[in-house]
Amino acid sequence: MRLSKPVLLSVSLVLAAPAFAQNVAVIRFPELQKRLARPTDTTYVVNFWATWCAPCVKELTNFEQLRLTNAGKKVKVLLVSLDYASQLDKKVRPFVKQRGLKAEVLLLDEPDPNAWIDKVDTKWSGALPFTLIFNNKTKQRTTYERELSATELTAALKKFQ
């Protein structure tokens, strides 16, 4: 049986989409730090979370909603999981797939949080959830060490626009 190129392309895209949507990259802090230091006019909304953190899980839909609302704008939602790297295939990827998260998800592979937390924000105690919103071009920056509602998240982002 011979399939046409458009049919093959369509089937390939359908099969590849779920795998792409669930891609979770494992990174170290220096790599994350470089990404956060880029001199762009994009506003970044970076949420530090974990699958075992109930308030984190509850607010993830708010970040997805924010991502969708700001599609096409210079706003980037980045979800940074603090689960253990050993849990990537057992917990994190299945969790991301089950929740239908489409924002970029990174798993931060750093065994000692005390070595990097102050580099994200000196006022951060290390508690989750933690959200950092910043724009390097305008030098605006704000942080939240608590769960954010959709309304609070939208209002926080509006201060950057």
Please tell me what each predicted stretch does.
Residues F95-L128:
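Short, internal strand/loop/helix patches
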